[in-house]
Regions:
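N-terminal pre-core extensions flanking Radical SAM catalytic domains
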Residues: 1-125, 143, 315-364
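Conserved strand-turn element in the central/C-terminal portion of the radical SAM core barrel
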Residues: 232-259, 280-282, 326
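Boundary detector for helix-to-coil junctions that initiate low-complexity/charged tails
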Residues: 345-423
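Short clusters of small/polar residues that mark proteolytic maturation junctions
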Residues: 25-26, 161, 418
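Catalytic cores of alpha/beta
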Residues: 255-271
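Conserved alpha-helical substructure of the radical SAM core
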Residues: 31-34, 39, 73, 77-204, ...
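Conserved, mostly hydrophobic/aromatic
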Residues: 42, 206, 249
Length: 423
């Protein structure tokens, strides 16, 4: 790994419904779109100034344009295994796209509360527009491509456009293999055969977020737990028959599901799947971020979450924990950590009502609360030998005109958004 570099900008591209093209998942990079497929030629996009500059940075092991909180090879072995290669294997002067992810359609047959608040289906005019671009724009990109991926924005089996596009690819490019990101309900033997890809599968990712039907129904609205497990059973047989390279099950950690984590890992084992744990990001979805983010020490269930995380077997080769979550598995003295987290949390009893009526902690005047914390430490007879310097630090951060506080507790950093009153 020492001298390996990320292959993504030399091999991959992701295309969104508006035509914007990225060299990596936009959540994992600070880089803007390198072009637009509806207004530019592929050569203009792939060899654009932005693309070349990004590749040159990666070539020199400069990852300043990457979001290392989400994609860090030092803390996320999966990233290291699949994305980092020997530089000698890369054609710096004439890179060719080998993997294209099409995130064109937001249509989905369920409403995961992590993602959206209702089922979404493209209007017919939008589907017709995308279908009109299949032969004109999308298919010419696929010469030399080895894998196509559907989709980062919806469910490929619920999208009329994606289903049609996939059928056309399978007919014209029989050697291309497929990665699918899906909720799994429509990922059946019948649908895979209907699209002509059942013998061309590479990886299937399924967003599960649970290990029990009760938890599943809280998070996945309009889902079908029994049908999902039937399809998982089928996919596990494909793994056994070497007809599917990899099955990945995703779990975004929330206050509603974190207690399912141990059972989820066992469920993955049952279905010959790799288990992926992700931290909830304040991007979209129906939740009030503070109320569900058990990673923050102010959350009332943070202690319970920490104990579960520190008991995980991180040596499990089929368990992948995102960098933002992995740090919680590395706490050496759980009782000491929780003592200081609890003391700090007890100083923050002011609460507010958010737009959706869910209560969450308000973080104001943190420096003053640290002073109160010092008094609490004295009351609890905790030794003060430089303890605040060792345990806590507070700093301000400004980004995108938003104010944040960064608090460090026992070496773990927590970034809090400072909200205005009335929010």
């Amino acid at each position: 790994m020492k001298n390996n570099i990320c292959k993504a900008p030399f091999f991959t591209a992701e295309i969104f419904g508006g035509g914007d093209v990225y060299l990596c998942c936009p959540s994992y990079t600070k880089l803007n779109a390198i072009g637009n497929i509806f207004t530019q030629s592929w050569d203009e996009i792939w060899n654009s100034k932005e693309a070349v500059e990004f590749r040159n940075k990666i070539k020199n092991s400069d990852y300043s344009d990457c979001n290392m909180n989400y994609c860090n090879p030092n803390f996320f072995p999966f990233c290291r295994e699949v994305a980092y290669v020997d530089p000698a294997k890369l054609d710096y002067d004439n890179p060719k796209v080998r993997i294209i992810k099409f995130s064109l359609d937001r249509s989905c047959n369920v409403a995961c509360t992590i993602c959206r608040d209702k089922v979404y289906c493209n209007e017919e005019c939008r589907t017709n527009f995308l279908n009109s671009k299949i032969d004109e724009v999308f298919m010419p990109l696929l010469d030399g491509v080895e894998i196509v991926n559907f989709t980062g924005t919806g469910d490929p089996f619920a999208s009329k456009h994606d289903r049609e596009f996939i059928k056309r690819i399978a007919q014209k490019y029989p050697n291309i293999r497929y990665d699918f990101h899906t909720n799994g309900i429509l990922c059946s033997k019948e649908n895979l055969e209907r699209m002509g890809v059942i013998d061309k599968l590479s990886t299937i990712q399924i967003s599960l977020h649970s290990a029990t039907e009760e938890t599943y129904n809280k998070i996945v609205k309009f889902g079908n737990w029994k049908l999902l497990n039937k399809n998982l059973e089928f996919l596990s047989h494909l793994i056994e028959q070497n007809k599917l390279n990899e099955l990945q099950l995703n779990f975004v950690v929330l206050s509603e599901n974190y207690k399912d984590i141990p059972a989820f890992i066992q469920l993955c084992k049952k279905y010959h799947a790799k288990a992926f744990l992700w931290q909830y990001r304040d991007i979209e979805g129906v939740y009030d971020y503070d109320s569900v983010n058990v990673c923050y020490p102010l959350h009332r269930e943070h202690a319970s979450f920490i104990r579960i995380m520190t008991e995980l077997d991180t040596s499990n080769p089929d368990l992948f924990i995102s960098p933002l979550l992995r740090k919680y598995t590395q706490i050496k003295n759980v009782d000491e950590y929780l003592l200081y987290a609890d003391i700090f949390s007890n100083q923050n009893n002011e609460r507010y009502e958010s737009k959706n009526g869910i209560l969450g902690p308000r973080l104001f005047n943190i420096e003053q609360q640290i002073k109160q914390l010092q008094l609490s430490m004295e009351d609890n007879k905790v030794k003060k030998d430089n303890i605040l310097k060792r345990i806590f630090s507070v700093e301000n951060k400004y980004s995108n005109n938003a104010k944040h506080k960064i608090i460090t507790i026992l070496g773990l950093k927590f970034i809090f958004k400072i909200r205005n009153k009335g929010v």
